[in-house]
């Protein structure tokens, strides 16, 4: 097995992109699944029924599959940097709207829209594959996916 040319302690060029990509993925993943540690508080604050909790859990992933296709198309057209930047900005806004929700309906709508954030994975895969040569793409994408899903 050959060693890779990835110096994880470097913040130059491709390694900088790798670190920024996995951190962006980490942020999207954290926003996408922020409801899990908050669910007990949400249940109590909003008086959610077990069915409403299940609905929120389903809504969280309902938009993700079509969103990954849409995001993939946008990445092909506009490039990963622009699309990731826009996705991060939108996901931050959605997270704030979710935090300011006053009813189950507002929680449900914002949770559904936050499913779009789960498409961030697609962007980083493309970005990493553009910056790393074929012999390093596997390890780079492993770092991106592994650290991003921390």
Language-model segments: what does each one mean?
Residues 110-147:
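Cytoplasmic helix-loop-helix junction between adjacent transmembrane helices
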Residues 33, 60-69, 119:
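Residue-level signature of mid-helix packing/kink "hotspots" within the transmembrane helices
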Residues 16-50:
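Extracytoplasmic
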Residues 24-25, 29, 61, 95, ...:
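Helical-face signature of the major facilitator-like transporter fold
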Residues 28, 57-60, 64, 114-115, ...:
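Structural signature of transmembrane alpha-helices in multi-pass secondary transporters
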Residues 49-57:
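Juxtamembrane helix-start elements in MFS-like secondary transporters
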Residues 66-105:
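Conserved MFS/SLC helix-loop-helix module at the cytosolic interface between two early adjacent transmembrane helices
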């Amino acid at each position: 097995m050959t060693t890779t040319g990835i110096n994880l302690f470097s913040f130059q060029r491709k390694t900088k992109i790798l670190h920024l990509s996995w951190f962006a993925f980490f942020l999207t993943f954290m926003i996408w699944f922020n409801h899990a540690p908050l669910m007990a508080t949400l249940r109590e604050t909003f008086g959610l029924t077990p069915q409403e909790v299940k609905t929120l859990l389903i809504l969280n992933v309902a938009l993700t599959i079509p969103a990954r296709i849409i995001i993939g198309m946008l990445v092909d057209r506009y490039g990963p940097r622009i699309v990731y930047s826009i996705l991060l900005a939108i996901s931050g806004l959605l997270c704030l709207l979710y935090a300011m929700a006053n009813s189950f309906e507002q929680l449900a709508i914002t949770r559904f829209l936050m499913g779009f954030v789960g498409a961030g994975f697609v962007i980083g895969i493309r970005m990493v594959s553009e910056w790393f040569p074929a012999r390093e793409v596997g390890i780079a994408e492993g770092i991106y996916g592994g650290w991003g899903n921390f």
